[in-house]
Amino acid sequence: KYNSFGEHNNEMLKEFLNKFKFKFIFKSSTENYKEGIFNNSLMRVLEKYEDVMNIILPTLREERRKTYCPFLPICPKTGKVLEIPLIEMDKKTGKIIFDNNGDKIEASILNGNCKLQWKVDWAMRWFTFDVDFEMYGKDLTESAILSNKICKTLGKNPPNGFAYELFLDEKGEKISKSKGNGISIEQWLRYASPESLSLYMYPNPKRAKKLYAEVVPKTVDEYLTSVEKFQSQKEKDQILNPVWHVHSGKPPSEKVVMPFSMLLNLVGSSNADNKEILWKFINRFHQDMKPKDYPILDSLTEYAINYFKDKVEPNKKFKKPSSIEK
């Protein structure tokens, strides 16, 4: 389906951005290298080679310092990125010579023949595109400090940075794919709307958040409460309501008939496995309600069934009846 793992990741990123209706211009680093978009910036890095090395080398172990080079040539035979020491350079032509196990390799740094080590690459992208704001995980804070220095060395101000905390599981431990603790963004979007996830992310952006299954129903109910509350608020208070920000100033108007937690109980007690059956039970309490008139509730019926099937039903334990109960 994809030509490379990188292309797969790019498509996943675009899919995520589209789900949340981000306006974006996608730029492939590989294509930018090959098309020469980075050429001027690469020549600038070569021009400032000694200054860049003075920033990076003190952060490396002694053994690594002997072989480190910010430029990584692409092997003409295999197409693989080579991490080998630099012997010579020509700052005017952009040609550099590397030592590949005793063999000298001459390479141009232009048009995709070389890539940069990532901390230098990060700064080079900021320099190229005049990036003025960059978000990154807390674990990249030290790298961002180095890239800021390199960007200044190249001749431009680095972007304003925003370091965010990483997600934790219900025990307060880091989420790990190998452990399978916590839930993924994809799972959240199976159990609840993108807007509920936006609401979850909205408060305290610099604080570590616990991300596990039980958080979803609670957040959905908070979202429903905020949507309903918005309609009766004065304008100055509406702006303080998180759904104003989640919906870019235009939150939906829908009366909340039942919270998500109640809907989950209804799924469990009715044993409904599709939203049509669930709506029949809803109509027992609210006869005149129709799915088309309550789009939020209608979407919640599907989310509730998915959540119940995945997170509640597998953990249900039934008591064995006693002889009297039989």
What residue ranges belong to the model's regions?
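Short, intrinsically disordered, charge-balanced linker/junction segments flanking boundaries
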Residues: 317-326
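Hydrophobic alpha-helix feature that most strongly marks membrane-spanning transmembrane helices
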Residues: 1, 152-155, 201-202
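A structural signal for well-ordered alpha-helical segments within the folded catalytic domains
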Residues: 7, 11, 36, 141, ...
